[in-house]
Amino acid sequence: MNRLDFVDQASLRDDIPAFSPGDTINVYVKVIEGAKERIQVFKGVVIRRQGGGIRETFTVRKESYGVGVERTFPVHSPNIDHIEVVTRGDVRRAKLYYLRELRGKKAKIKEKR
């Protein structure tokens, strides 16, 4: 194992739940405003998961006041307090970019049974 792999291994988090594209999750993000630190919840559908190891990222999409908002998070970021899986989605794709054009009921994802 070379030095970079050793450093990467030490930085990996082990408290991340298993989730995949199509799942609805709550991401609890640490927000620092001046000297204060608070936790902000970002709830949405995972539309992609990309990369591996320390460089792994995922993108969450939500509708906020009729406007689509997407946010990409590193999986092993120290700015993420914790992740909570709300529902498991039943999808047939790994990347759900088609949800960007859909609105309302058409953007609904079936729940896994």
Curated annotation (Swiss-Prot):
GO terms for cellular component: cytosolic large ribosomal subunit. Keywords: Ribonucleoprotein, Ribosomal protein. The keyword Ribosomal protein applies. It holds the Pfam family Ribosomal_L19. One of its GO terms (molecular function) is structural constituent of ribosome. One of its GO terms (biological process) is translation. Belongs to the bacterial ribosomal protein bL19 family. This protein is located at the 30S-50S ribosomal subunit interface and may play a role in the structure and function of the aminoacyl-tRNA binding site. PANTHER family: LARGE RIBOSOMAL SUBUNIT PROTEIN BL19M, RIBOSOMAL PROTEIN L19. This is Large ribosomal subunit protein bL19. It comes from Mycobacterium ulcerans (strain Agy99). The lineage of its organism: Bacteria, Bacillati, Actinomycetota, Actinomycetes, Mycobacteriales. The gene is rplS.
